[in-house]
C-alpha cells in the first residue's frame, strides 16, 4: 500500500454524524464506472482512481461497522479500522475477476474490524485460535439470555458452529469474565465506569441486513460466479482457482504449465478464454 493510500485510509473520522452524512453523499458507481476506475488503478497506478473507488464505498464500511456496535467500542474507531480494510481491498482488487468491488471488499473490511475488536475488547485476548474466533463472533448471535447456557443450549450452539461443547463453555466463561483496569479511577461513582460489553452484547439497533445484505449484492455476485465457474471445463476451473481464487497459494503460469504438460503461453490463453466466459456469464 502506498503512503498516499495509507494516509487516506487513516484520515481522522472526526464528528461521526457529519462523517456518515459525507460518506452517504458520495454517489455510488455504476458497474462500468467502477471497472474503468479499477482498470486505471490496476494497470496505471492511478491514485485519483483509487481515491474515487474508496470514497464511493465508505458508506458500506459504515454498514459493516454498525454490526459490531454491541462490543462497546467507539463506532468511529470501528469505521476507521474498516476503512483500512477497504483500502487493502481496493489495492488488491483486480477488475478482470468480474465481480463488484463491494463483494470483494466486504471480507477485508470485516477482517480488519474483527482484529480491532479482538485487540481492544478485553485486556486479555479472548480468542486466539480459529475455533475461538468463530465462537467469539457468533456466540452473541445465538445467546438467548444473559445468564449461563444450560447443557442443551451449549450442545445446540456447538452443533450450529461446528465446535465442541467444551469450546463453547470456555468461550462463554471468557466473555463473562470481568477485566481489571491498570489505572483505577479516582471517581468512585459507579455510573461513571463503563459497563462490561457482555451486559449488552444483544444489540438490537444494529442490523447489517439493512446495509449490504439488504441489497443482496454479495450473494448475487457469489452465486453468479459459482454458476459461471460450473460452465467451464475442469481444467479451466482449476486454472481460475489457482490463479485468482486461492489467495494464500496462487500458482504461476509456469507451475500450471508443468502440471498440465503444456506451455505457459497456452495456460495464459486458457486463462484469458475462461475469464472472458466468466465475465459474459456474470454480466448476462
From Swiss-Prot:
Its main location: cytoplasm. Keywords: Cytoplasm, DNA-binding, Sigma factor, Stress response, Transcription, Transcription regulation. GO terms for biological process: DNA-templated transcription initiation; response to heat. It is found in: Cytoplasm. One of its GO terms (cellular component) is cytoplasm. GO terms for molecular function: DNA binding; sigma factor activity. A motif (Interaction with polymerase core subunit RpoC) lies at residues 77-80. Residues 228-280 are annotated as: Sigma-70 factor domain-4. This is RNA polymerase sigma factor RpoH. It comes from Citrobacter freundii.
Amino acid at each position: 500500500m502506498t503512503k498516499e493510500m495509507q494516509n487516506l485510509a487513516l484520515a481522522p473520522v472526526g464528528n461521526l454524524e457529519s462523517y456518515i452524512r459525507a460518506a452517504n453523499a458520495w454517489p455510488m458507481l455504476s458497474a462500468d464506472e467502477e471497472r474503468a476506475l479499477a482498470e486505471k488503478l490496476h494497470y496505471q497506478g492511478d491514485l485519483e482512481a483509487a481515491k474515487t473507488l474508496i470514497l464511493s464505498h465508505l458508506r458500506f464500511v459504515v454498514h459493516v461497522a454498525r454490526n459490531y456496535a454491541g462490543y462497546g467500542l467507539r463506532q468511529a474507531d470501528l469505521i476507521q479500522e474498516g476503512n483500512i480494510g477497504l483500502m487493502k481491498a481496493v489495492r488488491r482488487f483486480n477488475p478482470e475477476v468480474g465481480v463488484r468491488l463491494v463483494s470483494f471488499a466486504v471480507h477485508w473490511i470485516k477482517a480488519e474490524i474483527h482484529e480491532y475488536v479482538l485487540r481492544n475488547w478485553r485486556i486479555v485476548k479472548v480468542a486466539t485460535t480459529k475455533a475461538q474466533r468463530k465462537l467469539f463472533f457468533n456466540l452473541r448471535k445465538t445467546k438467548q439470555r444473559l445468564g449461563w447456557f444450560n447443557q442443551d443450549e451449549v450442545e445446540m450452539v456447538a452443533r450450529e458452529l461446528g465446535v465442541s461443547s467444551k469450546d463453547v463453555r470456555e468461550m462463554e466463561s471468557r466473555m463473562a469474565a470481568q477485566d481489571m483496569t491498570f489505572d483505577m479511577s479516582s471517581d468512585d461513582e459507579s455510573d461513571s465506569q463503563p459497563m462490561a460489553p457482555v451486559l449488552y452484547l444483544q444489540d438490537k439497533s444494529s442490523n447489517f441486513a439493512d446495509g449490504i445484505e439488504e441489497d443482496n449484492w454479495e450473494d448475487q455476485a457469489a452465486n453468479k460466479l459459482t454458476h459461471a465457474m460450473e460452465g467451464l471445463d475442469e481444467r479451466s476451473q482449476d486454472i481460475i482457482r489457482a490463479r485468482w481464487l486461492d489467495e494464500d497459494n496462487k500458482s504461476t503460469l509456469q507451475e500450471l504449465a508443468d502440471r498440465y504438460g503444456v506451455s505457459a503461453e497456452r495456460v495464459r490463453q486458457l486463462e484469458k478464454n475462461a475469464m472472458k466466459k466468466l465475465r459474459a456469464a456474470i454480466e448476462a
